[in-house]
Amino acid sequence: MPARLDARATRRYFDSAFNSPAVKILPNEYYVTNGEDVMLSTVLGSCVAACIHDPVIGVGGMNHFMLPEGDIHSPASATMRYGAFAMEVLINELLKAGAVRERLEAKVFGGGAVLSAMQLMNIGERNGQFVLNYLKTEGIPVRAQDLGDVHARRINYFPRDGRVMVRKMAPHHQKAEALIAQREAAAAQTVQAETRAAPRVERFARPGGMPV
């Protein structure tokens, strides 16, 4: 996969508060573990993060997308900024790592109406509804959710056991608002720009009889 269009997160650090190695997930990125004991962390405004894992083997991953779906005829739709593509990439990578589709469980977060521009476009609500509908269609149960509201959120996810720690940031928190405004404004500008064609993702097989 092209690093810029559907990027696997690479920013590693040690989180002293949780005494754990960690990977920072930025907008339009994802990360899937392969049995490693690591925390995945991201900050969300109107964006949504899906945390999905296989509880039997302790493999899990997180994505971070900005918009639900793009024009299916546009090459820009096949990028991690769009939920439809980001969810497909995440699930595909989990299956490649040994997860069993019937055992997958999800927790979803974000979709806040944090910035006035995003409120007008209803982006957060659309993202939240999209991820719930997507998981329902694919038969993946949602074990926990924290969507909507006016708060930015910091998400710390432990894929090995599925734990998630959510910290809501107070409205008008200057540092949080500046960070989110910068990231989401940049992402919004990127969405408007033309992007080169991305390779198609091979769709995962859906077993017969799965609930939709």
Swiss-Prot record:
Pfam families listed in its UniProt record: CheD (PF03975)
Statement: the UniProt record of this protein carries the keyword DNA repair: no
Catalytic activity annotation: L-glutaminyl-[protein] + H2O = L-glutamyl-[protein] + NH4(+)
Residue ranges the record marks as coiled coil: none
GO MF annotations, alphabetized: protein-glutamine glutaminase activity
InterPro entries (UniProt xref): CheD-like_sf (IPR038592), Chemorcpt_Glu_NH3ase_CheD (IPR005659), Cytotoxic_necrot_fac-like_cat (IPR011324)
Record GO biological process: chemotaxis
EC numbers: 3.5.1.44
Enzyme class: hydrolase
Keyword Zinc-finger assigned: no
Keywords assigned: Chemotaxis, Hydrolase
Family listed: Belongs to the CheD family.
Role according to the record: Probably deamidates glutamine residues to glutamate on methyl-accepting chemotaxis receptors (MCPs), playing an important role in chemotaxis.
NCBIfam families to which the protein is assigned, alphabetical: PRK13487.1, PRK13489.1
Name assigned to this protein: Probable chemoreceptor glutamine deamidase CheD
Organism, scientific name: Bordetella parapertussis (strain 12822 / ATCC BAA-587 / NCTC 13253)
